[in-house]
């Protein structure tokens, strides 16, 4: 009896799987009750990255940490980029929103948020690179976005302007954290950098740099320097937009 199925060339193509991990089901494939979850996989990856850096994270390493076969994890996390997105969202779940409840004082609220974010970046040194390079659209990242919009609502800025302000805010803190990491990892590099810039300032080729060096005091406490820089960023966020 001839088959009732149409030739393969006439069958509709299977729908393409969503690229975003957040649009995919928690687990694909049939079989017994899942032994793992995205949460446990992300937690294992975060632990590896905290101990050894982001470059040490691989599906093989995560599988070994969970006592699972590498290929079995692809039922939960189809590719490395998805794992990075899960790690980012797992880390930003650590915000203490009870301590960050908006008070109506935007400057104070943003300062508290900035200090929590810097603490998060210090606990997870790999996090700044992901915040800058990956879209923060997981459920925990969206909660952070919603909180930032709530904190900045009293400014009267539109939603688009406040989203731009959030990008500025996050970018500053992540880059500050990365600079801290570089300085801590290479004391010799830091000493050479200061000496190099001092010689450049004294060369006569950079008069404004020379003036800045002449009128600047010693670096001082890193946390105090962060407070000053964060306050400038917050001032920029709260400033009325320039008429165009």
Language-model segments: what does each one mean?
Residues 129-131, 185, 209:
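Short, hydrophobic secondary-structure boundary micro-motifs
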Residues 40-47, 82-98, 109-116, 143-147:
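Alpha-helical structural segments
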Residues 62, 140-144:
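Hydrophobic alpha-helical segments that drive targeting, anchoring, or assembly
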Residues 2, 188-244:
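A structured, mid-to-C-terminal "fold-capping" secondary-structure block
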Residues 40, 44, 48-81, 86:
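Helix-turn-helix
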Residues 1-35, 207-216:
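N-terminal intrinsically disordered/low-complexity leader segments
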Residues 144-195, 237-244:
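Hydrophobic alpha-helical bundle segments that form small-molecule/ligand-binding pockets
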Residues 98-140, 160, 169:
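Hydrophobic alpha-helical connector segments
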């Amino acid at each position: 009896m001839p088959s009732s199925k149409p030739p393969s060339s006439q069958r509709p193509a299977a729908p393409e799987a969503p690229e975003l991990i957040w649009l995919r089901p928690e687990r694909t494939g049939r079989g017994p009750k899942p032994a793992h979850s995205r949460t446990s996989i992300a937690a294992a990856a975060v632990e590896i990255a905290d101990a050894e850096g982001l470059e040490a994270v691989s599906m093989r390493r995560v599988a070994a940490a969970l006592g699972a076969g590498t290929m079995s994890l692809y039922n939960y996390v189809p590719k490395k980029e998805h794992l990075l997105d899960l790690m980012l969202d797992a880390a930003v779940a650590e915000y203490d929103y009870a301590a960050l409840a908006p008070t109506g004082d935007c400057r104070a609220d943003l300062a508290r948020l900035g200090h929590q974010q810097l603490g998060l970046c210090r606990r997870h040194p790999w996090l700044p690179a992901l915040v800058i390079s990956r879209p923060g659209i997981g459920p925990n990242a969206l909660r952070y976005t919603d909180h930032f919009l709530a904190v900045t609502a009293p400014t009267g800025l539109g939603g688009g302007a406040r989203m731009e302000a959030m990008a500025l805010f996050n970018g500053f803190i992540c880059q500050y954290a990365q600079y801290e990491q570089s300085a801590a990892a290479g004391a010799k590099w830091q000493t050479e950098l200061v000496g190099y810039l001092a010689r450049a300032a004294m060369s006569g080729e950079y008069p404004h740099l020379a003036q800045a060096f002449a009128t600047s005091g010693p670096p001082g406490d890193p946390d105090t320097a962060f407070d000053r820089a964060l306050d400038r960023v917050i001032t920029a966020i709260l400033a009325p937009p320039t008429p165009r």
